[in-house]
């Protein structure tokens, strides 16, 4: 479908993403409106950058875990004098328990890339049938972040399911399987696993070991993005999650190895830091920093990727 951002998408998206939560929100006398502002920056070894902006309104706002809304966004991709804007409209919905994060967290919408209207989103439904067991269903999609893929309007989707199981007081295992189709006809079968061992539970310190792999259905994607027939990666490291006042601070630092097809194993590394908490009044901010030295969508030797994101929610007085 060729369009910049079809007019019918606005109405259809608003109806799809907002009709149900609108009815539910109308019953609460404590609901209010909030302003949402997000900014993100990305860079990598290919000097492929992305500056993303999102702004919108949240309705039926009870907390950062309970609201719905609409937002406009734009991602400005650039590399070596080339640039492209990918703009879109996004519907937002969140209804999760504060103690377990059970419930639904969803954002879904349409963006315009290379004259094509593409669906994007990130939807996760989580449930704990028992205190020691968790289940998640995931649906997601986005544009493929390389210059060649953006010029051709290539995007991807993701359908996945994961199971989390606690073994005793200190050990947790997570297994995820998924399918990742691309609009160019390629697809990937995904498998990921994680083992978490609590070292100092009272301090929030854990040891994590992770495995991820995928197999591609079509090796030839005309160099639009990094696409080996088979990719495998493992890493291990320390993670920390603590509450400091009203803030939640978490971090991860680790290293591992990756293998592309039958080539030799290469060293990888990852570092991540996230902080979320209150600002003045009822406002809330979340900051996330990430640095990774593992393969992504770009086919570059000694690849690295870095990102920084800031998310601010400001409830308005009624």
List the model feature ranges, each with a label.
Residues 9-21:
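Bacterial N-terminal signal peptides
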Residues 25-318:
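Gram-negative and organellar
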Residues 1-6:
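Positively charged n-region of N-terminal signal peptides that target proteins for export
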């Amino acid at each position: 479908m060729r369009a910049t951002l079809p007019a019918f998408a606005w109405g259809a998206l608003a109806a799809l993403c907002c009709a149900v939560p609108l009815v539910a929100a109308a019953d609460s006398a404590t609901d209010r409106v909030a302003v949402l502002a997000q900014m993100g920056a990305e860079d990598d070894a290919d000097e492929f950058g992305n500056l993303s902006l999102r702004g919108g309104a949240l309705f039926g706002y009870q907390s950062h875990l309970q609201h719905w809304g609409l937002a406009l966004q734009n991602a400005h991709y650039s590399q070596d004098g080339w640039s492209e804007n990918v703009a879109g409209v996004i519907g937002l919905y969140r209804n999760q328990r504060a103690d377990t994060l059970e419930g639904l967290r969803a954002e879904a919408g349409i963006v315009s890339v290379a004259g094509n209207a593409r669906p994007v989103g990130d939807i996760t439904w989580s449930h704990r049938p028992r205190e020691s067991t968790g289940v998640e269903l995931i649906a997601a999609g986005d544009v493929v972040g390389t210059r060649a893929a953006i010029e051709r309007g290539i995007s991807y989707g993701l359908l996945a399911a994961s199971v989390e199981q606690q073994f005793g007081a200190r050990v947790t295992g997570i297994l995820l399987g998924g399918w990742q189709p691309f609009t160019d006809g390629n697809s990937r079968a995904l498998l990921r696993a994680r083992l978490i061992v609590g070292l100092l539970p009272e301090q929030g310190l854990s040891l994590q070991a992770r495995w991820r792999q995928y197999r591609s259905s079509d090796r030839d994607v005309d160099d639009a993005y990094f696409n080996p027939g088979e990719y495998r990666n493992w890493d291990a490291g320390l993670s920390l999650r603590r509450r400091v006042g009203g803030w939640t601070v978490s971090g991860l630092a680790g290293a591992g190895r990756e293998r592309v097809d039958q080539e030799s194993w290469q060293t990888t590394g990852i570092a991540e830091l996230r902080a979320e908490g209150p600002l003045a009044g009822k406002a809330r901010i979340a900051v996330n920093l990430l640095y990774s030295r593992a393969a992504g969508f770009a086919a570059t030797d000694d690849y690295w990727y870095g990102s920084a994101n800031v998310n601010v929610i400001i409830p308005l007085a009624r």
